[in-house]
């Protein structure tokens, strides 16, 4: 397989969903089918008038809403990509930021920029009709998860503009950019790779707010990269490669270097927990304290985690690891300038990713809200 996306046309989204579901363990697919059946029966029996239990929530100002920002989680990648541009807007043009609403997933939301006086609403048909009549634009990570899917649907119903912010590194199975969108990409190379020349997408290379935040922490982390054996960032949950590949890469690195294995937050399934337990019995250190990457010490390695570039931006040694990488993964490493680690060698660390702009969040804000709200 070459380094090209599997799903780059907007009409490929159903294929992406089918592919994603096919990667789930059989038990998860069975549970999902059962839940869907129960929900369908419940909907028929109760004739629900709401948008459903899984509908995202709306956090809206008292006045007009000209922009919706859709969060799929409250994790650092989503907040850096989607909340930091609003923070930049609130600093530069607070009167415009006052009209920004939010589409929220389940869970307790952190303090969001410009939203101190906002109120939460269920996304019922009445609320959507009455409160979003003046919607002019939405900002999303994509339309493949609930918040972004709802925001894009509402935008299309109202003829509003759709802005897509790249929030992570682009692997071969990345879902497609929505139709007729403006894409705020990390680099022009990423934009070209992701869209494959699509005429309906306007690409604006801006850089990564997450990586810029990592770069700005570098002075406070002097010496962090040389202190101890470091960490290997887990990705056992990933669908892009077989689980055995992620495990083999981790074992190769931690056994050679003494690094700790740092599970991804999504590694909560039975198979992942079993793998962690087996590694512990074999003497591998498992760093499951949940502290942010910036709080760790020493070099950073992974198969293709964004954490490799976060570490590089902060001046820490960082490498990519896979015993026998497929062609698409080697292309991925080249696209981001990731240096491959091999046993018995000391390669040059991965270099920081060059950014097209000095302040990605401010660049996104300036382009998204370049017109009067």
Describe the role of every protein-language-model region.
Residues 2-9, 14, 45, 49-199, ...:
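Active-site and donor-binding regions of nucleotide-sugar-utilizing enzymes
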Residues 20-56, 166-167, 176-241, 265:
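A nucleotide-sugar donor-handling region in carbohydrate enzymes
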Residues 172-177, 193-196, 213-218, 294-295, ...:
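Short, charged, surface-exposed secondary-structure boundary motifs
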Residues 205, 306-359:
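Catalytic binding pocket for nucleotide-activated donors in carbohydrate/polymer assembly enzymes
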Residues 267-314, 318-319, 324:
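Donor nucleotide-activated moiety binding/catalytic core segment of transferases
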């Amino acid at each position: 397989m070459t380094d090209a996306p599997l799903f780059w046309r907007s009409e490929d989204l159903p294929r992406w969903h089918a592919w994603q579901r096919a990667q789930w363990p059989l038990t998860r697919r069975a549970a999902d089918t059962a839940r869907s059946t129960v929900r369908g029966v419940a909907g028929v029996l109760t004739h629900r008038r709401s948008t459903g239990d899984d509908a995202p929530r709306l956090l809206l100002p008292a006045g007009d809403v000209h922009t919706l920002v859709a969060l799929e989680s409250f994790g650092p990648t989503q907040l850096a990509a989607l909340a930091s541009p609003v923070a930049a807007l609130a600093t530069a043009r607070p009167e415009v930021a006052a009209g920004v609403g939010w589409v929220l997933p389940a869970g307790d939301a952190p303090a969001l920029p410009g939203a101190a006086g906002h109120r939460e609403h269920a996304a019922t048909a009445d609320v959507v009709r009455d409160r979003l009549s003046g919607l002019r634009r939405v900002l999303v990570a994509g339309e493949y998860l609930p918040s972004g899917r709802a925001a894009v649907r509402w935008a299309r119903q109202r003829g509003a503009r759709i802005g897509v912010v790249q929030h992570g590194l682009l692997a071969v199975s990345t879902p497609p950019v929505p139709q007729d969108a403006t894409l705020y990409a990390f680099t022009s190379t990423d934009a070209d790779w992701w869209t494959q020349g699509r005429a309906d997408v306007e690409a604006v290379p801006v850089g990564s707010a997450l990586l810029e935040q990592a770069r700005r922490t570098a002075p406070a982390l002097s010496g962090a990269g040389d202190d101890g054996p470091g960490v290997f960032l887990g990705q056992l949950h990933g669908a892009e490669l077989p689980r055995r590949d992620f495990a083999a890469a981790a074992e190769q690195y931690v056994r050679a270097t003494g690094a700790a294995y740092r599970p991804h937050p999504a590694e909560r399934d039975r198979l992942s927990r079993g793998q962690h337990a087996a590694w512990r019995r074999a003497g591998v250190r498992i760093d499951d304290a949940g502290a942010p990457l910036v709080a760790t010490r020493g070099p950073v390695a992974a198969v293709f985690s964004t954490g490799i570039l976060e570490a590089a931006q902060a001046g820490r040694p960082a490498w990519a690891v896979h015993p026998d990488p497929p062609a698409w993964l080697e292309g991925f490493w080249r696209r981001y300038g990731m240096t491959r680690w091999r046993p018995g060698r000391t390669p040059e660390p991965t270099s920081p990713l060059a950014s097209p702009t000095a302040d990605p969040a401010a660049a996104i804000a300036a382009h998204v809200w370049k017109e009067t709200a």
